Regions:
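Long, compositionally biased intrinsically disordered terminal regions
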Residues: 120-218
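Short loop/turn segments at secondary-structure transitions that flank enzyme active sites
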Residues: 14, 67, 127
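Short, intrinsically disordered low-complexity segments
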Residues: 27-119
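Juxtamembrane cytosolic/matrix-side boundary and N-terminal portion
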Residues: 216-233
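Short, extreme N-terminal segment that most often corresponds to the first beta-strand
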Residues: 1-30
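Juxtamembrane boundary at the C-terminal end of a transmembrane helix
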Residues: 237-245
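A contiguous, surface-oriented mixed alpha/beta subdomain in the mid-to-C-terminal portion of proteins
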Residues: 94-95, 105, 124, 220-221, ...
Length: 245
C-alpha cells in the first residue's frame, strides 16, 4: 500500500479542548462546511480540509502536511513552529508526536514534544541523508538495533534477500508507524491498526482552503543550495589556479 500521511497525535485523556479551540489555535479561518468522516480518511488527505478526532486517549489531527511541513521539514533545530507553540498552550503537560510520510519519494519525518519542549526531530527522503536533532527515542533504538553503517550511511539487511541492503529512507513504514504507535498503541499499517480506522472524525473545510505544499519542496531547495555552493567553490578554485600558476 502507498502512504501519503500526516498526523499530529496529542495526549488528551481529559478531552476537554474543543475542535473550535484547536482550529483557532492553528490559525484556520472561517469554516465553510464540515462532514462526518473516519480515521481511515487520514491517508491522502489533499482536499484543503483538516480532520480532527479522538483515538485511544489522544487528540488526532489529520492536517494534509499543513502543520507538519512547518514543524518537520522547515526547522533546522528543536525550536517549535508557531502552530506547535499554539497547540502546546492548549496541552501544556501533554506528549505530542507528529509523523508524516510519502511513499513516492520514500519520505518520512517525525518529532516528539513533551511538556512544551521538542526533544526529537528527524526527516529523510530518497537521495538525502537523515536530518535529525535531539536524542533517539526508544522506538528508534529498537529499529536501529538491526542496522549497520556502510560508507557513512545506515542500512539494514533485507529479510527476504540477505544479499540486499535496505537504506534508511526505505524503512519509512517502520519509523513512521512505530512512532505513531507510541501514542496510539497500535501500528496503523498492521492488523491491530485496522480496528481504530473506523473511529469517527470530523473534516472541516475552511472558506479559504489550507495551503498544501509538496513535502519534498524543502529538501529540493536545500539540494540546489548545496549544488550552487559547490559550483561556486569550483569556479573560485579555477580562478585562484590561474592567478597562482
Amino acid at each position: 500500500m502507498g502512504w501519503k500521511t500526516s498526523l499530529i497525535l496529542i495526549e488528551s485523556k481529559d478531552n476537554n479542548v474543543s475542535d473550535a479551540e484547536i482550529l483557532k489555535a492553528l490559525g484556520i479561518g472561517e469554516i465553510k462546511s464540515q462532514s462526518d468522516s473516519s480515521f481511515d480518511a487520514f491517508n491522502y488527505l489533499d482536499d484543503g480540509s483538516i480532520a480532527i478526532g479522538r483515538v485511544n486517549g489522544n487528540l488526532v489531527i489529520c492536517d494534509g502536511y499543513y502543520i507538519t511541513e512547518k514543524s518537520l521539514e522547515m526547522p533546522r533545530s528543536l525550536r517549535l513552529c508557531k502552530e506547535e507553540k499554539a497547540l502546546c498552550k492548549l496541552f501544556p503537560n501533554s506528549e505530542m508526536v507528529s509523523v508524516a510520510c510519502y511513499s513516492a519519494i520514500n519520505y518520512h519525518g517525525y518529532s516528539l514534544i513533551q511538556n512544551g519542549n521538542k526533544l526529537r526531530l528527524k526527516t529523510i527522503s530518497d537521495g538525502e541523508r537523515a536530518r535529525q536533532f535531539g536524542k533517539r527515542t526508544k522506538e528508534e533504538d529498537e529499529i536501529y538495533k538491526g542496522s549497520f553503517v556502510k560508507k557513512r550511511a545506515t542500512y539494514w539487511k533485507d529479510d527476504l534477500d540477505p544479499d540486499e541492503d535496505i537504506g534508511e529512507d526505505q524503512m519509512m513504514e517502520d519509523f513512521t508507524f512505530e512512532m505513531a504507535k507510541r501514542r496510539l498503541g497500535v501500528r496503523l499499517d498492521g492488523a491491530d491498526g485496522m480496528e481504530i480506522l473506523n473511529e469517527p472524525f470530523i473534516k472541516y473545510f475552511p472558506v479559504k482552503p489550507i495551503k498544501l505544499t509538496e513535502v519534498d519542496e524543502v529538501p529540493k531547495k536545500t539540494s540546489w543550495k548545496t549544488y550552487a555552493i559547490i559550483i561556486a567553490l569550483v569556479l573560485l578554485w579555477q580562478v585562484f589556479k590561474r592567478l597562482l600558476f
